[in-house]
Curated annotation (Swiss-Prot):
GO MF annotation: an example: ATP binding
Disulfide-linked positions: none
Family membership: Belongs to the SAICAR synthetase family.
Its EC number(s): 6.3.2.6
Lineage: Bacteria, Pseudomonadati, Pseudomonadota, Gammaproteobacteria, Enterobacterales
Protein name: Phosphoribosylaminoimidazole-succinocarboxamide synthase
Transmembrane segments: none
Naturally occurring in which organism (per UniProt): Erwinia tasmaniensis (strain DSM 17950 / CFBP 7177 / CIP 109463 / NCPPB 4357 / Et1/99)
Gene3D superfamilies attached to this UniProt entry: ATP-grasp fold, B domain (3.30.470.20), Phosphorylase Kinase, domain 1 (3.30.200.20)
Length: 237
């Protein structure tokens, strides 16, 4: 499947059309951003790692009965995916307190959240992805109540699958975000799942193994991503 016109260029991925209107090419670049895109750097191998990591995770989720946009790996940094009508709201699950939750509520980082928290954020970098709720989604017409309920259900199901997957690899799934879209009327998981959009800590040391290494200038970003991938059994080379 050959990519054609560039449709969208995000902070770390580019989307291309194909000869099939139902399919797109998702290209993972080496770009890494923080502060809603204000800080951007390039890291060798990052696009390849995230592409293969995402394919691995999406395959695991599909095997668990969660519909995803993934069709096939095309190359080291490209994947063939379904063309979704994306919902402008992202779902976040928090198993432990970290990031904006700690800043907002003043709770201790690492606090276990039982049951896990479910948050919604409007996808808008210019407005710094403001937190919203179900009422906002209905009033502004971002997503129907039925589709939002399905998104919530699939997000919690993904959390069950992935928490065990990472725990078996000696990692804590602290939190993560998921984006969904509609494909022929069905809610389908889109975008990506990688250490760019999840917080992953080593179970024993609590070392951060995700993009917080870049956000907090800890160093060793690619080494951490590669270690997570290797622990899970993702074939990188």
């Amino acid at each position: 499947m050959q990519k054609k016109a560039e449709l969208y260029r995000g902070k770390a991925k580019t989307v291309y059309s194909t000869e099939n209107p139902d399919l797109l090419v998702l290209e993972f670049r080496n770009d890494t951003s923080a502060l809603d895109g204000e800080r951007i750097e390039q890291f060798d191998r990052k696009g390849m790692i995230n592409n293969k990591f995402n394919h691995f995770i999406m395959t695991k989720l599909q095997e668990a009965g969660i519909p995803t946009q993934m069709e096939a790996l095309l190359s080291d940094n490209e994947a063939l995916v379904k063309n979704l009508d994306m919902v402008p709201v992202e779902c976040v699950i928090r198993n432990r307190a970290a990031g904006s939750l700690v800043k907002r509520l003043g709770v201790e980082e690492g606090m276990i959240l039982n049951p896990p928290l479910f948050d919604l954020f409007l996808k808008d970098d210019a407005k710094h992805d403001p937190m919203v709720n179900e009422s906002y989604c209905e009033t502004f017409g971002w997503v129907s109540q039925t589709h939002l309920a399905r998104m919530r259900e699939l997000t919690y199901r993904a959390n069950e699958v992935l928490s065990k997957l990472f725990a078996d690899a000696g990692l804590i799934l602290v939190d993560f975000k998921l984006e969904f879209g509609l494909f022929k009327g069905e809610v389908v998981l889109g975008d990506e799942f990688s250490p760019d959009g999840a917080r992953l800590w080593d179970k024993d040391t609590l070392n951060k193994m995700d993009k917080d290494r870049y956000r907090q200038s800890l160093g060793g970003l690619i080494e951490a991503y590669e270690e997570v991938a290797n622990r899970l059994g993702v074939k990188l080379d």
